[in-house]
């Protein structure tokens, strides 16, 4: 899942809604230790995979099962062995083909008869990430995996010793071996333990389930509420939904404390820790022993964990860039959900497609910017400041407990 707080979120989360067992297939080699270089595309790890002598880009995603694009399916024609309902990150469900992929190579590792799914013909996040498939957790279930974001290397092995370092116990709750751990959210003396999925296919640090946030206001500060569009998933752009902007004073992962964590809520069943965790330290997943190790990099600041937040966000609707969500309530008298975005800082974006919009970066990230909008109701054109959202300026109580 890719987080763009200014623009949009891409959620690369794939799970079956029926009792399908995707822990099928194997690694050919008896003993293997591979040091694999990866590139970061929009903050996510992407690795080279070889199929029939041709190299393809695959997302390395612990929050998903093995999957390929419809284009790659048509090129390779693996056998279809069934169909299943697949849930995206917003909880929407669509029917997909289940395949048995005969052989693919991830450097010196050969995956044989891997079970996975074929995504739809029009898969916008595959197009924008320029990837052809997903290396999922079901392929890693008998291995130890180490992701080192500083060196941009992934180790996959069945003979790595993790030593006697502290670890988090991993839990598998589905038949695709997606790794869950428990973290702690704390505010003063009050704290709760929260089960989260470690999802390397999500760029931001932490997504908290919407209902969990509402139920735990003792440890979570709700600083803004809005209804809008934040996400693009495997089934396309998500529908308009209610979202919360949250402040969590402390989040503890593997005995390491992250302070002043600013996040938004997710509308699916899982809370998730994403790939931004990799910026802070080396993550090792021992799937066989069910252990997650996290080793903090030197000279890393964990005092403030926040994305670049702005007063409103932009999405795509009816093939046009539009206002997708408004966090600053004082702007609701000036702009509307669905107002067409004509330009950003004088750059005409009316003809931009989704991938161009996702590639746009504000420089520098914390400055104010100017957006030209066409009012969805009146057609009036006006220029509006898109400002950095300084949390202390907007913090307010949106929810009160009934006595």
Task: Show where each model-derived region lies.
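Pepsin/retropepsin-fold aspartyl endopeptidases
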Residues: 18-403
